[in-house]
């Protein structure tokens, strides 16, 4: 089996360092709040397509400059469940208080697959990060698909899956943050159907497009019938070298860009010291 793991690619205008064998890269000596020339933006985007998750250290953004940068990469949208900044509805603060016990995003997921047109990516800006914990993992869903047998690939390519916003486990991860910043939506209001295997519109590579947080069943099958196959697909990330981990405690002011079309992620729940 020939899996396409992370390889070093040369860039002319930016310094890119792969961070793991499966996906992820660190980009150095770029200030994202500057009015960067088009050739730099193009290479940043190329790095995103190549490595699926890219990180930038020591970034300082105001909401205005963060939105301006995001608009050069894609089209920012509004997250439907949590209150955003008043003047910048595309930016959603993710705040965890000392008394909160649930991690927002603390289940393997791809963002908002319950929407008819989910976003192509997500941008995360770590402003105040704990010295202990705060880690995030990503899984390369290209590799998840490529690890399958030809028979399983052929079968999955015929399927579509239902995705909803209100599965019990993901609703629980929102519970603390929605106490403080809910916009009033009920968890089961949003639903969409997507192919189980999607082809990336730019790289043309195939990847799995199901996730534990939102996918409930295959179209034409009950949840009970779908569950064994879905559980197998959900667990592929644990059975192969498809992961990268970001130790959030190492850097404040860290910026990440994720290609949501071919990755899933998990905000790790860390036990308290002592």
List each language-model region with its residue ranges.
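Non-heme Fe(II) oxygenase catalytic core, chiefly the N-lobe of the double-stranded beta-helix
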Residues: 2-252, 258-274
